[in-house]
């Protein structure tokens, strides 16, 4: 984990913003991948899914001049078992650069492999479902899919490349999930600012990062519904392009350089309930955002704007929406205890949060969600 910049009394002094060396977004960019990667070397290791390879390989091959490509199929979980398996393949292949093509767990795994093998990494999202691509962070789970730890990396990816033609062809639920993840960015950055917490790159939030987090939220409010409607029809409008940038870049820089707080800690707590494992990351984070607002005693207008937005685009605002058909108090309390773990980000909230407080906020958020969506 990157050390915080501190003075002699242990107070964090520097404001730090982290970002990829280069961010590229446009239509048909997959054909240019090998030429972009050429600056790092000719031997490219590409981690993707079996279906992802079928979608991207023709375009990559069409644009490839003289690079040597080694593909490997991701096993589905960003865990140390998978990371170590891939490290062995990379070392045996003599690869120069790690390229992760796919979704959030492929990105996190690729970044971890690049870190442990000391190689550059290029992240290529084929979906806009999380803000993982731009961050210097990998979220590590157990083999069974339960949150284990954050792996804080010394730098952001060397390059992030988004081919919007490919992203627009993904199921719309993935774009919506990305909006759920991005929804938390501003509120968590605001909480960290209020509590004077450090961000994920070991410093304080810069003006630029806070404004990117605010722009992320504003972009969702202004474009989210239009983007969802267009994406359902497979149409890549300007609203869809804007949301892809918000989900990927604005949220990525905003969360990492603004900081994480309650919403993501709550997401991590919910991994303890098996029924939620079928939900996407951003869907759980969206409900975590609502819980965080209840925990903060946010204004009714703000809470209602979030509930209305989530309801309109299809993000969960109730426990039932997370797949929990039977709410068991002991399970919710376990979620609260896990979310309040000392090594998670609940400690960045501008108030002391005990598991009992969080339990009440979860149940309160569920009640609000049911009240406003079932009336």
PLM region spans:
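C-terminal charged capping/lid subdomain of soluble metabolic enzymes
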Residues: 3-10, 32, 298-375
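A short, small-residue-rich loop immediately preceding and capping a beta-strand
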Residues: 90-127
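Active-site segments that bind and position negatively charged phosphate/pyrophosphate groups
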Residues: 200-315
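Short glycine/serine/threonine-rich phosphate/pyrophosphate-binding segments
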Residues: 30-33, 53-57, 80, 105-112, ...
């Amino acid at each position: 984990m990157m050390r915080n910049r501190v003075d002699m009394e242990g107070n964090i002094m520097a404001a730090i913003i982290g970002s990829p060396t280069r961010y590229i977004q446009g239509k048909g960019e997959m054909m240019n991948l090998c030429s972009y990667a050429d600056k790092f070397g000719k031997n490219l290791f590409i981690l993707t899914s079996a279906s992802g390879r079928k979608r991207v390989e023709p375009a990559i091959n069409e644009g490839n001049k003289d690079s040597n490509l080694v593909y490997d199929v991701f096993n589905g979980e960003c865990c140390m078992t998978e990371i170590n398996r891939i490290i062995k393949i990379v070392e045996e292949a003599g690869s120069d650069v790690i390229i992760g093509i796919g979704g959030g767990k492929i990105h996190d795994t690729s970044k971890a492999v690049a870190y442990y093998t000391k190689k550059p990494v290029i992240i290529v999202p084929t979906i806009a479902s999380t803000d993982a691509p731009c961050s210097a962070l990998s979220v590590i789970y157990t083999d069974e899919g339960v949150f284990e730890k954050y792996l804080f990396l010394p730098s952001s990816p060397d390059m992030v490349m988004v081919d919007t033609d490919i992203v627009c062809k993904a199921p719309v639920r993935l774009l919506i999930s990305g909006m759920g993840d991005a929804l938390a960015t501003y509120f968590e950055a605001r909480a960290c600012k209020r509590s004077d917490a450090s961000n994920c790159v070991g410093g304080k939030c810069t003006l630029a990062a806070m404004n990117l987090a605010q722009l992320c939220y504003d972009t969702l409010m202004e474009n989210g519904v239009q983007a969802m409607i267009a994406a359902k029809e497979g149409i890549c409008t300007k609203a869809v392009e804007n949301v892809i940038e918000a989900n990927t870049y604005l949220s990525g820089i905003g969360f990492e350089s603004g900081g994480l707080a309650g919403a993501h800690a709550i997401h991590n707590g919910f991994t303890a309930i098996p029924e939620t494992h079928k939900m996407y990351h951003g869907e759980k984070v969206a409900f975590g955002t609502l819980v965080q607002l209840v925990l903060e005693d946010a204004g009714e207008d703000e809470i209602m704007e979030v509930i209305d937005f989530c309801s309109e685009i299809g993000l969960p605002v109730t426990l039932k929406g997370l797949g929990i058909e039977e709410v068991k108090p002991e399970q919710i309390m376990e979620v609260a205890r896990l979310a309040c773990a000392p090594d998670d980000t609940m400690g960045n909230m501008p108030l002391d949060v005990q598991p009992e407080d969080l339990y009440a906020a979860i149940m309160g958020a569920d009640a609000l969600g049911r009240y406003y969506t079932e009336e």
